[in-house]
């Protein structure tokens, strides 16, 4: 500071305003961390020091989280206590002082430049901190210390003042126009005359220029200013003083209390300073505490004369011509001070504001919304949603039929049942539409998924597309740091679907709320946290708030937030209706006076969030910015569901504080606005209070979207719909109109015009304020009392992008299905036509770097948008699913170079340029001549270039191109180089470093220049095969020429002298060309350099290839060290280039690779094409002379992309990202299918009848089809009916029809169920009324009988009706038997609605002849020729087959032909039993037809009486008249077909002479009674929901062994069998996944159908069972697409070799044929007890118990891989603790083809039966018995992982006890058996496993798996077997250990770690811990293993010596992808060990 200039720091008094100052501080604090910390610390100090104060003081402050909240309380009101005023003005001054100290540290100077300090009244307190502020840190500390002092001072003055007068009012007045002494005298006289006690008298406290301040009690001051003669007429002002000051009598004790006892107070004061404002400014103080006492005394007790202070100051500074006054905070005395100082002729500068600071680019704490998507009523996307808003549409409608039957629940008034008085809602058009294949979800699982979850998946993907999210190799966001927040609060879909679909393996994840968010993370492979939130109507706002919090806390880097609501459960309507919140008249009437509740609605929405700074850095489109968000609760509301306006206002203010904005900055408010009578006024009241003091004339516009689309209360219209609307307002720059307006407003609203709030009825421009963003306040509150709020800002980014230097660009699109493929292209094309001005570079950038890529791909390179449009229009073909091919880098040799060959890339590609420059630098350092111009300059003179320059330039170019390819993710699988190109190949493979390869090429070229004469030799290219070329050369008189290159099968190069080559060319007949090279490379001309070159090459390092090299010298692949060395390089220089041999070596090792040439132009590509003939699209050239480099590169990238290459698009575009913009291109074209279930109420749930009897539930539709349980409306119509077998009428039908003494449902019941169901459907969906006679049954087929044994007496018959074809009058009907979760397919038929008159007319033409035949049979019987039977005899004979109750016995007399081929009868139908209801009575149907059954089964000529003919269907049943009971009818039966095991009959029914019914093709098949008994009495214990197949009657034949040594050429005769196999595979996949066979295209990925590893095992087992062919569960890996299955399993009629047959023969040599050809054998129902040998040798019976709730234990052996019957002993691998062999599905194939069978746990499906009484011994008994049955002879090879290893050992023991030998045993990571039971530790073992497994989705278990794991843990803990005797031990045992323990997985679980420590369970290894019996079945696996822990670890006591292997993984990682290949290696070594001789 200049010596003639002085700084003055001015601190004003306590009455100054703090309003602007406090806002400015907090605004600056947003970008100044230390300032934010100070304000937080200051707040804490104030709050701490006021905790114990009295209620008056505490209440004056209230609750505040920060000082800005405190400021809000008094921004527009007066602080009658004064403490808040004191705190806030102090905070302003302290903050500004600290800022100045930071900005200008010299202000704390202690030398002659020390500023002067001036404090006016209470300003002295703020000033005092400077006395101890040698540094900024000390100043900071002192400010906090004085804050505590200020709090105590306020308390002292308040208490003192209130002791005089406890009332509100001003304690200070300013009086003008009277001197101080005159005023004192006047006050004394008047107060004395009024008798005012001295202690209460007002006094002069402060004197200024022509004014004085008097201080005293408010009542005294009021009296004085109004009545005192000397004052009452003078000008005067009331001051913001609310306690005594300058007039208080204080004692030393008072001052000590105020100053406090901090250690800082004792700090000595060494500074010399003047305290202007004190009576004695120059007084000296020993300590800071002394000074503070003096200051407090001055401010409290001593009057102040400001004029005197200023005069003294001016006098002292008279020698300083320049003064700099800095006002620390506001000061009302500043102008007086400066005027006095200026009056002496000095220059005075004034700084009355904060110190200068650099404003932040963005305010911190901002969150960018970078992507959004949504769908709801009337809209499938946000654009359509915006159109709904702009059109003011009200989308309320009556509840549609596809949700539920409204008539069942709607009542005009509520009654006691489940009723609703509203009919309305707002609904999505197609809530069930879902692209399941895109998300790899089977139709079966998709239907079980909550539609909200499905829709959320799709909107999330759409939002991610808008956000430009890409999952490529280079990612802007780490997937481990992406979080998902999903709002949901109901489980409607579970209630809708459960009683229709029952329970399934996918039910839990389908409807459980946590899966809404979890499935998002799973689908996109994210590892960040997932949250499923329920905060009722504010769930979305809450999810966004939590997402923002997580992002700001840096816990995550990207968040997906949103919610979904799809309403369809009627009881939600009924409960809400009864609670009175729903409108009975329609939609939400937001703001209106007729508001009467809200309207329920669908909506789904998603937003993608990032921190603003990250979004800018990632080049994202920022749709809007979340400036702040918040949530609180209406804790003081009148009820939990009532909103509290005060709580809402508090939240608004808090959020604005956090955002550093004020109510003046808000442009629009999107209100919750549900239209309820209480909620709307409360919300508007909160806004009115918030905006009551706005300073801007512009109105606040408010609106609410619920008036358009209703209120999806549980999840989103309360949040995400409003949010999407707000974002669109920013995007469109429009304030939209409010639906339902204009209209009279809610009368409970405050007067909106007075508070400047406006509700628009027409759209208007959304204008931007000057120099600040537009801001929207979005408000939500929920039904549970919560409030949520979001403050949005728009983001102005008007940066103009420069042009991309690249002139050609690659544009792509991709999909998962062909339909989506064409849809994506069409949508892109449409968008381009609508946006022709879009830049091609932005389209390319968006479609490549900012998209996720899928298998079916399109790519094209274009230079303009118009060119792109043309190419899109021209391409209409399908695209196959891409499969990634290996890439071969093919490096060009010399001879193709040209000037400027890399000039375009050098200018535009940083990677290429940097690599080329590096090569040039290295070459310069090695003293090689410059060559860069050859690459970079098109006008470079080529004729002047030497071989040295050319070869270095070509090599550098190729290395640069390779670097460019590798930088964008294209890595070669193998490299090959032609001649010089091999050097580039060796560098790229890692053999030669960059310096070495340049050195070798440069030195070799120098040697050539030195030793070889230029232009004396030549090279001739000839179009001849190498053999012909060689023969031609041999025939020459002078064979000096030689072959230099074998380029292709028909192209060679000859080298020799120019003379010889010229002569040779003249004699050639083949086409030839002289090459433009100066030397004869690869010829004898190179001989002079070889020795020296080899010596030079000996000095470089040759490393092992990291990438295989196809050597053109050796014609083989090289991937190991030792091949490349100096000698090789010399030979490579001299010997021919065998390019063909190298190509063939690649072809033999790599399947269908992509050939990518890297060089100056296309040269080697033609050689590849001529030699190998690959597809043209797989031969690529990086550069093409004469073509722009980016065009040729683009073509290469397009082809690579279409062939499945993973290109790092983000890396490609990164250098140019500042020139690129992310476009909002069309979203993915979904391939949608319908997954929807209509809710149908069961009978006992329907509303009961009302008292007036007008509203009752409907009776049963039919006894056989009682109620509708599902109704899906057209076009995908499906109606499902149920009928309970326990219904008395139904039960009588079954009980009255007995086969072999078992009740069996009559076949006529199925006809009745079908006819009744179709009749119902027709009446429901057709305008015409169709009667029964018009319905015809066709092709009825029954698969199995319906019995009580099948489903129990409480089972159900399910009838399903669906469209049967293109005709609307044809239906397919299917029947199932159901019990709980189990269902069985019973049969199906077609039902057609026909014209009965046409049928009758057709019959009338022939009925006479049939009726005549009836008469003939009757006459013949009466004459004794045929048989005449009375009913007693007929039904008595028939009882041998079937016994009927009386209701069925309607035959009055029967007439049977003598050959039993015809029969007739007279029938009189009985009335149906009371209580039944039929459309076509089964009693009548059975009675009219069962004569046919009698004829077939009672025929005396039948050869066997041990069989029964069962009716299993008919061709058709037609009827034109409804029969009547009591009326006689004639029936006629004729046998029309009779084969060995089947009989076909026709049945005709006559009413007199009129034919009224005809059953054609009634089919009976013969069944052995033994089989029939089993069929009728069998029980199926499966707990799955899928239909079980009918029993297979015939046995499989065991194929004979095949002599695999014999080669047979024959035409396959198995095409029909193969077709059956393929058909079975596809049908079973279809059934298991729920997919439609029609959707199975060749490119359909099986994983896309939802087939996971567990389902794969089920499918493989069923295929094996059905076809006899062993399909391995790994088929989903081996054959990933449907086309792969078709190629492998399709019928073949080609020559085949038996040893290569793809079918898998059975075990036929050393394995029992009991396994036959089945890869999956089940062994059911073992004995109910198993025998176990205990330690003592006694026999113990272990009772499994009845446990009727779970199936019996069952062993399943499944072929996992290998070839049965190949002479190898099978390896049996027992399932681990999960119980399922799915654990092993990731094991790669073993080259040995050893057959590996997996053995599931017998308790997999019944883990509750796996008790400790059963234990390891009991479980192993099941396995042992199954193995002995499967393999009666030979030795065994066993193994198991984890708990499976323990079972394997016990099976080994039991086999030994049965005298069966185990040859080899493989134990994978399992401790040896413990010598004792670990007490009370099993629970900790399970806790350990739960903690470690939940971190890995691959090990997340189902409930059943979890139960099995717990059971195996308990079993292992209690298993203490005897060691095997030496004679019983396996010959060889191998043990494989996991080297890593699982403790790292536990480290993040603090609770578990504490529990481990408490239990004393070790987490570190110690000697022999693996054998410690104190460690339970899991705890042993916690510590990491040392080398000493990788031995047998106790197993040697049980099995003897063992080979011990280990792998670097932990226990759970071993069988999982990423580590399973290591396990495969160790198992391979174990198998080799097993097979070793000896």
From Swiss-Prot:
Classification via InterPro entries: AB_hydrolase_fold (IPR029058), Ac_transferase_dom_sf (IPR001227), ACP-like_sf (IPR036736), Acyl_transferase_dom (IPR014043), Acyl_Trfase/lysoPLipase (IPR016035), Ketoacyl_synth_AS (IPR018201), Ketoacyl_synth_C (IPR014031), Ketoacyl_synth_N (IPR014030)
Catalytic class of the enzyme: transferase
- Fetch the PANTHER family from UniProt: FATTY ACID SYNTHASE (PTHR43775), SI:DKEY-61P9.11 (PTHR43775:SF37)
Q: Where is this region: Product template (PT) domain?
A: 1221-1572
Q: Which residues form the Ketosynthase family 3 (KS3) domain?
A: 364-794
Q: What does the induction field say?
A: Expression is positively regulated by the zearalenone biosynthesis specific transcription factor ZEB2. Conditions for carbon-, nitrogen-, or phosphorus-starvations lead to very low expression. Increase in pH results in gradual reduction of the gene expression.
What the entry lists under Pfam families is as follows: Acyl_transf_1 (PF00698), CurL-like_PKS_C (PF22621), ketoacyl-synt (PF00109), Ketoacyl-synt_C (PF02801), PP-binding (PF00550), SAT (PF16073), Thioesterase (PF00975)
| Location of the region described as C-terminal hotdog fold in the Swiss-Prot/TrEMBL record | 1425-1573
Summarize the record's disruption phenotype note: Results in the loss of zearalenone production but still produces beta-zearalenonol.
What Gene3D superfamilies does the entry give?
3.30.70.3290, 3.40.47.10, ACP-like (1.10.1200.10), alpha/beta hydrolase (3.40.50.1820), Malonyl-CoA ACP transacylase, ACP-binding (3.30.70.250), Malonyl-Coenzyme A Acyl Carrier Protein, domain 2 (3.40.366.10), Polyketide synthase dehydratase (3.10.129.110)
The name on file for this protein is Non-reducing polyketide synthase ZEA1
Protein encoded by which gene: ZEA1
């Amino acid at each position: 500071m200049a010596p003639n200039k002085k700084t003055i720091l001015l601190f004003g008094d306590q009455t100054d305003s703090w309003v602007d100052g406090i806002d400015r501080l907090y605004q600056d604090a947003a970008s100044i961390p230390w300032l934010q910390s100070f304000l937080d610390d200051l707040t804490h100090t104030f709050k701490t020091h006021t905790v114990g104060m009295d209620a008056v003081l505490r209440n004056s402050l209230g609750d505040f989280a920060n000082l800005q909240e405190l400021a809000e309380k008094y921004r527009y009101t007066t602080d009658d206590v004064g403490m808040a005023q004191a705190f806030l003005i102090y905070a302003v001054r302290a903050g500004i002082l600290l800022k100045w100290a930071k900005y200008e540290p010299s202000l704390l100077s202690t030398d002659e430049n020390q500023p002067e300090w001036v404090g006016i009244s209470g300003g002295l307190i703020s000033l005092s901190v400077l006395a101890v502020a040698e540094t900024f840190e000390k100043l900071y500390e002192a400010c906090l210390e004085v804050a505590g002092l200020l709090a105590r001072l306020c308390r002292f003055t308040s208490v003192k003042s209130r002791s005089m007068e406890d009332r509100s009012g001003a304690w200070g007045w300013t009086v003008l126009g009277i001197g101080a002494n005159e005023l004192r005298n006047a006050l004394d006289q008047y107060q004395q005359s009024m008798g005012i006690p001295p202690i209460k008298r007002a006094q002069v406290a402060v004197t200024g220029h022509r004014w004085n301040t008097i201080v005293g009690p408010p009542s005294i001051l009021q009296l004085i200013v109004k009545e005192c003669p000397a004052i009452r007429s003078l000008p005067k002002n009331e001051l913001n003083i609310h306690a005594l000051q300058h007039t208080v009598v204080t004692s030393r004790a008072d001052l000590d209390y105020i100053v406090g006892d901090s250690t800082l107070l004792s700090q000595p004061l060494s500074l010399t300073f003047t305290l202007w404002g004190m009576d004695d400014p120059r007084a000296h103080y020993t300590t800071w505490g002394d000074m503070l006492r003096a200051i407090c005394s001055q401010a409290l007790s001593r009057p102040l004369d400001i004029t005197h202070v200023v005069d003294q100051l001016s006098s002292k500074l008279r020698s300083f011509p320049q003064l700099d006054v800095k006002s620390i905070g506001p000061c009302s005395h500043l102008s007086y001070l400066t005027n006095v100082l200026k009056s002496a002729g000095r220059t005075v500068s004034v700084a009355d504001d904060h110190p200068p600071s650099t404003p932040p680019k963005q305010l911190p704490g901002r969150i960018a919304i970078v992507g959004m998507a949504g769908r709801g009523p009337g809209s499938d996307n946000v654009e359509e949603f915006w159109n709904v808003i702009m059109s003011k549409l009200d989308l309320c409608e009556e509840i549609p039929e596809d949700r539920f039957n409204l008539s069942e629940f709607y009542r005009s008034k509520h009654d006691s049942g489940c009723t609703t008085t509203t009919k309305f809602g707002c609904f999505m058009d197609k809530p069930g539409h879902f692209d399941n294949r895109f998300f790899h979800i089977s139709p079966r699982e998709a239907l079980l998924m909550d539609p909200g979850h499905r829709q959320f998946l799709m909107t999330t993907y759409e939002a991610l597309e808008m956000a430009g999210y890409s999952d490529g190799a280079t990612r802007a966001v780490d997937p481990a740091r992406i979080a998902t927040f999903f709002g949901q609060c109901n489980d409607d879909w579970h209630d809708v679907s459960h009683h229709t679909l029952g329970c399934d393996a996918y039910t839990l994840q389908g409807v459980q709320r946590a899966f809404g968010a979890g499935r998002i993370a799973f689908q996109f492979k994210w590892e960040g946290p997932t949250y499923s939130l329920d905060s009722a109507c504010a769930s979305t706002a809450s999810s966004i708030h939590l997402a923002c919090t997580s992002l700001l806390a840096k816990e995550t880097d990207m968040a997906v937030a949103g919610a979904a609501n799809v309403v369809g459960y009627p009881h939600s309507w009924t409960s809400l209706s009864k609670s009175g919140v729903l409108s009975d008249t329609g939609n939400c009437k937001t703001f209106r006076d007729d508001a009467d509740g809200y309207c329920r609605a669908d909506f789904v929405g998603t937003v993608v969030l990032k921190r603003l700074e990250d979004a800018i850095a990632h080049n994202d489109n920022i749709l809007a910015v979340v400036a702040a968000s918040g949530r609180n609760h209406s804790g003081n509301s009148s009820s939990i569901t009532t909103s509290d306006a005060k709580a809402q206002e508090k939240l608004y203010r808090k959020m604005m504080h956090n955002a550093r904005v004020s109510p003046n900055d808000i442009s629009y408010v999107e209100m919750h606005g549900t239209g309820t009578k209480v909620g709307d006024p409360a919300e508007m009241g909160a806004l009115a209070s918030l905006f009551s003091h706005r300073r801007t004339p512009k109105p606040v516009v408010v609106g609410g979207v619920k008036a358009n689309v209703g209120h999806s209360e549980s999840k989103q219209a309360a949040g995400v719909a409003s949010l999407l609307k707000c974002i669109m307002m920013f995007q469109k720059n429009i304030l939209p109109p409010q639906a339902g307006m204009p209209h009279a407003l809610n009368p409970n609203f405050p007067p909106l015009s007075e508070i400047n709030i406006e509700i628009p009825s027409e759209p208007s421009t959304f204008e931007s304020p000057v120099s600040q963003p537009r801001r929207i306040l979005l408000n939500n509150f929920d039904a549970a009392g919560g409030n949520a709020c979001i403050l949005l800002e728009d983001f102005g980014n008007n940066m103009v992008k420069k042009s991309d230097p690249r002139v050609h660009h690659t544009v792509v699109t991709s999909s998962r299905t062909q339909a989506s493929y064409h849809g994506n292209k069409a949508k892109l094309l449409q968008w381009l036509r609508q946006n022709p001005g879009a830049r091609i570079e932005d389209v390319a950038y968006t479609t490549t770097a900012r998209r996720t890529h899928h298998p079916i791909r399109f790519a094209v390179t274009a230079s303009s948008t118009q060119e792109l449009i043309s190419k899109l229009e021209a391409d209409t073909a399908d695209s196959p699913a891409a499969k990634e091919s290996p890439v071969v880098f093919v490096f060009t040799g010399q001879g193709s170079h040209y000037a400027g060959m890399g000039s375009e890339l050098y200018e535009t590609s940083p990677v290429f340029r940097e690599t080329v420059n590096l090569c040039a630098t290295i070459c310069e350092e090695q003293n090689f001549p410059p060559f860069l111009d050859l690459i970079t300059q098109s006008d470079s003179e080529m004729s002047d270039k030497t071989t040295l320059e050319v070869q270095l330039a070509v090599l550098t170019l190729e290395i640069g191109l390779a670097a460019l390819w590798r930088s964008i993710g294209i890595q070669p699988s193998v490299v090959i180089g032609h001649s010089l190109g091999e050097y580039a190949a060796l560098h790229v493979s890692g053999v030669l470093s960059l310096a070495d390869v340049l050195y070798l090429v440069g030195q070799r070229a120098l040697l050539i220049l030195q030793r070889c004469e230029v232009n004396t030799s030549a090279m001739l290219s000839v179009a001849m095969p190498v053999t012909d070329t060689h023969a031609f050369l041999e025939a020459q008189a002078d064979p000096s020429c030689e072959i230099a290159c074998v380029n292709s099968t028909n192209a060679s190069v000859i080298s020799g002298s120019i003379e010889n080559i010229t002569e040779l060319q003249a004699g050639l007949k083949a086409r030839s060309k002289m090459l433009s090279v100066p030397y004869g490379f690869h010829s004898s001309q190179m001989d002079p350099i070889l020795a020296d070159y080899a010596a030079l090459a000996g000095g470089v390092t040759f490393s092992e290839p990291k990438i295989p090299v196809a050597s053109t010298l050796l014609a083989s692949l090289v991937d190991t060290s030792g091949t490349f060395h100096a000698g090789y390089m010399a030979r490579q220089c001299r010997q021919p280039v065998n390019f063909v041999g190298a190509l063939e070596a690649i072809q033999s090792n790599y399947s269908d690779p992509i050939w990518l040439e890297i060089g100056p132009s296309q040269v080697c590509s033609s050689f590849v094409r001529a030699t190998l003939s690959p597809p043209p699209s797989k031969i690529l050239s990086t550069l093409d002379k004469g073509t722009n480099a980016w065009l040729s590169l683009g073509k290469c990238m397009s082809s690579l992309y279409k062939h499945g290459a993973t290109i790092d698009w983000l890396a490609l575009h990164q250098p140019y990202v500042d020139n690129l913009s992310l476009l909002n291109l069309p979203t993915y074209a979904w391939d949608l299918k319908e997954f929807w279930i209509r809710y149908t109420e069961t009978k006992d749930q329907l509303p009961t009848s009302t008292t007036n009897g007008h509203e009752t539930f409907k009776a049963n539709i039919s006894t056989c089809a009682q109620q509708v349980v599902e109704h899906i409306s057209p076009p995908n119509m499906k109606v499902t009916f149920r009928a309970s077998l326990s219904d008395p009428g139904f039960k009588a039908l079954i009980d009255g029809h007995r086969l072999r003494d078992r009740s069996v449902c009559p076949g006529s019941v199925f006809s009745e169920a079908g006819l009744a169901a179709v009749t119902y459907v027709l009446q429901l969906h057709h305008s015409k009324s169709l009667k029964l006679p018009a319905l015809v049954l066709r092709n009825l087929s029954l698969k199995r009988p319906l019995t009580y044994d099948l489903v129990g007496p409480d089972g159900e018959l399910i009838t399903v009706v669906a469209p049967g074809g293109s005709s609307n009058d044809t239906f397919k009907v299917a029947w199932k038997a159901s019990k709980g979760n189990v269902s069985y397919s019973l049969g199906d038929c077609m039902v057609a609605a026909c014209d009965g008159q046409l049928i009758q007319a057709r019959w009338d033409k022939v009925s006479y002849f049939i009726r005549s035949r009836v008469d003939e049979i009757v006459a013949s019987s009466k004459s004794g020729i045929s048989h005449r039977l009375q009913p007693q005899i007929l039904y008595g004979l028939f009882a041998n087959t079937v016994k009927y109750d009386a209701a069925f016995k309607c035959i009055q007399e029967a007439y049977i032909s003598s050959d039993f081929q015809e029969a007739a009868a007279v029938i009189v139908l009985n009335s149906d039993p009371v209580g039944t209801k039929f459309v076509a009575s089964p009693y009548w149907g059975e009675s009219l037809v069962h004569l046919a059954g009698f004829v077939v089964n009672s025929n005396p000529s039948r050869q066997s009486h041990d069989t029964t003919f069962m009716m299993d269907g008919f061709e058709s049943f037609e009827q034109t008249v409804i029969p009547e009971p009591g009326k006689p009818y004639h029936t006629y039966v004729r046998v029309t077909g009779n084969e060995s095991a089947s009989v076909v009959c026709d049945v005709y029914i006559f009413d007199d002479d009129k034919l009224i019914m005809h059953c054609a093709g009634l089919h009976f098949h013969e069944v052995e009674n033994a089989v029939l008994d089993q069929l009728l009495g069998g029980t199926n214990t499966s707990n799955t929901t899928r239909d079980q197949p009918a029993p297979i009657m015939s046995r499989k034949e065991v194929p004979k062994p095949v002599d695999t040594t014999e080669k047979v050429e024959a035409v396959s005769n198995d095409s029909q069998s193969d077709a059956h196999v393929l058909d079975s595979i596809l049908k079973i996949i279809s059934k298991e996944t729920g997919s439609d066979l029609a959707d199975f295209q060749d490119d359909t990925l099986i994983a896309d159908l939802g087939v996971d590893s567990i389902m794969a095992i089920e499918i493989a087992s069923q295929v094996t069972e059905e076809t006899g062919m062993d399909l391995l569960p790994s088929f989903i890996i081996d054959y990933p697409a449907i086309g792969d299955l078709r190629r492998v399993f399709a019928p073949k009629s080609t020559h085949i070799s038996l040893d290569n047959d793809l079918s898998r023969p059975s075990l036929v040599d050393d394995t029992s044929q009991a396994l036959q050809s089945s890869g999956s054998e089940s062994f059911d129902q073992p004995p109910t007890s198993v025998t176990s040998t205990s330690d003592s040798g006694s026999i113990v019976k272990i009772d499994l118990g009845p446990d009727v709730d779970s199936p019996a234990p069952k062993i399943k052996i499944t072929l996992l891989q290998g070839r049965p019957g190949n002479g190898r002993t099978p390896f049996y691998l027992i399932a681990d603790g999960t119980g399922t062999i799915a654990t092993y599905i990731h094991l790669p194939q073993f080259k040995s083809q050893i057959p590996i069978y997996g053995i599931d746990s017998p308790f997999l499906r019944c883990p509750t039966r796996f008790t400790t009484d059963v234990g390891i011994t009991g479980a192993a008994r099941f396995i042992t018995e199954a193995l002995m049955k499967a393999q009666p002879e030979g030795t065994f090879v066993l193994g198991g992982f984890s708990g499976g290893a323990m079972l394997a050992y016990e099976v080994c023991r039991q086999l030994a006890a049965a005298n069966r030998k185990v040859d080899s045993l493989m134990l994978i990571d399992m401790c040896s058996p413990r010598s004792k039971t670990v007490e009370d530790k099993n629970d900790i073992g399970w806790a350990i496993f739960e903690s470690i497994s939940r971190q890995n989705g691959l090990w997340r278990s189902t409930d059943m798996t979890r139960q099995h794991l717990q059971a195996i843990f308990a079993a292992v803990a209690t298993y203490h077997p005897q060691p095997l005797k030496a004679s019983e031990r396996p010959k060889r045992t191998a043990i494989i250990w996991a080297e890593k323990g699982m403790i790292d997985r536990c480290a993040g679980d603090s609770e578990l770690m504490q529990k481990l420590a408490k239990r004393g369970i070790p987490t570190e290894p110690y000697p022999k811990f693996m054998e410690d019996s104190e460690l339970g079945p899991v705890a042993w696996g916690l510590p990491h293993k040392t080398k000493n822990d990788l031995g047998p670890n106790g197993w040697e006591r049980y099995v003897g010596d063992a080979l011990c292997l280990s792998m670097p993984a932990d226990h759970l990682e071993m069988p999982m992808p990423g580590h399973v290949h290591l396990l495969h290696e160790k198992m391979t070594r174990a198998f080799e060990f097993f097979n070793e001789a000896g």
